[in-house]
Amino acid sequence: MDNLKECIVCKNKKTTYLCSNTAMMHVGTKEFKFFICEICNLVFLNPRISKDQLKEYYKDFYLPYRGPSAWGKYQKFAELSQKRVDDRRTKMLRRYSSPDKESIILDIGCGNPTFLETCNFFFESSLYGIDFSDHGWKKEKDRFKMLNLEVRDVDDLKPNFSPHIITLWHYLEHDYYPNKTLSKLASISNSKTKLYIEVPNYNSNSRKKFNENWAGFHTPRHTFLFSPKNIEILLNNNGWEIDFIEQKGTINPYILTWMSEMEIKGLNWSDSMENQFLNFFCGMIKHKFRQLFTNISDGNMTVIAKKIDNLS
């Protein structure tokens, strides 16, 4: 087990016990503890399990690994939902970066690389994706042959790589060493590089509603939970400054609400989700109407940042 002695954002040693919960999307009774920094409100798992132990929580039945197929006869609806997320993300890139055929786009933690596949449809850019495992693409190599996909760590990226766009879609909350990662990415970037980060927002309404049952904890896979204030400090400390924070994120916020409700219910996540679809769909429609009248974060946030000018 790995114990943190201080906040990784502000270096404060004064932390307070926040809550405990058991592993999510997993069967087990072991409890994990989360603490909160008294200065910047960063929330973190402490102690953290070793990376070797962490593999026990990424089994083949892990829902993100199963993807749309987990929804049985409703698979096409799930695929459409993922396409909408990928379309929102590429639209965001067009708005803030305008990628062209000279651009290099790097997706960290690419998983099943449908986002890069969508980028290939809209842009003529060079597309790269890295992950700690090839689980997301190894069974569909022909489908993704136009992408440069590798099993590697951020530390392995070459100093002269110089991507124009770097994306971390729900990666940073899993990272054991966010400072090291962000600093490394700044070191390989150029003055025009834009960084896109999406993470669960600890300040969101869904977290306040579900507390320790909030699916954003995703225990024990998520080691840090960020809020707008502390993620800005973290980025500034490592060579980046924020251009904009999109409080609603790109993923349907109802997903976090639904997963939180299912954790309370005790859903067997290894089962087919087919029987859950109709209730999920009805809940999503109701939630969508409520969201039309607010800009308050209800789950995730997307941060767009640029490299600080005085860094080479």
Task: Tell me what each language-model feature is.
Residues I197-F224, K229-L234, W258-S260:
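Short, glycine-/aromatic-enriched active-site segment of Class I SAM-dependent methyltransferases
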Residues E212-W214, N252-D309:
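Membrane-proximal basic amphipathic "stem/tether" segments
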Residues N179-K194:
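A short glycine-rich, Lys/Arg-flanked "PGG" loop and its adjoining helix->strand segment in the class I
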Residues M1-W169, P178-L182, Q247-K248, N268-Q276, ...:
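Conserved N-terminal segment of class I S-adenosyl-L-methionine
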Residues K229-E261:
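Substrate-binding/catalytic lobe of Class I Rossmann-like enzymes that use SAM or dcSAM, i.e.
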Residues H174:
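Phosphate-binding active sites in nucleotide-utilizing proteins
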Residues S20-N21, K30, P163, S206-N211, ...:
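Short aromatic-enriched loop/helix-cap "lid" or pocket-rim segments at secondary-structure transitions
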